[in-house]
Amino acid sequence: PISRPRRYAWAMAARIALLLLLGFAAACAQRGVPPRTVERLELERYLGTWYEIASFPSWFQRNCVATQATYSRTDDGRVRVENACRDKTLSGAWNGIEGIAWPAEPGDFTRLKVQFFWPMRGDYWVLALDPDYRWALVGHPNREYLWVLSRTRAIEEPRYAEIVALAQAQGYDVTKLRRTLQPA
């Protein structure tokens, strides 16, 4: 017969193993489910300049500070994307790239396809958006890319924490977020 303390230890170990297994299963399930986008986006209100507050590091933004994106309509109804940043320091040279974006589904600007180089395309999903279009949370459905954008170069810390919590709730690894240096 197994002693009472030993049974208790086995029961606790089994509970802990079950909790770990359930946590792992929940994490895997979240990975298989694409993130949710905002229900609706009014493109005319979204157009204009946005400043990057934070992002996941990426090879294509290596050495970037003071990063900003400007969106405008093209004659054919698509969106012109102009990304710019300074090289390494706030006084560094400006670097930029132009691309084009269009809705993945006609009329739905919450999920865009973006192309900077033919034939490569990327996904640009608006995950959260301030009702007054003051800030936006943008990500890729594979959760490897994430951006916190604002109409101003700075955002209040409590608001930033709320946005980060929204990203985490959608399954993004927010420990990878890095703040973007912007001029004061």
Model-based region annotation:
Residues 16, 23, 28-184:
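A beta-rich soluble binding module of mature secreted/lumenal proteins
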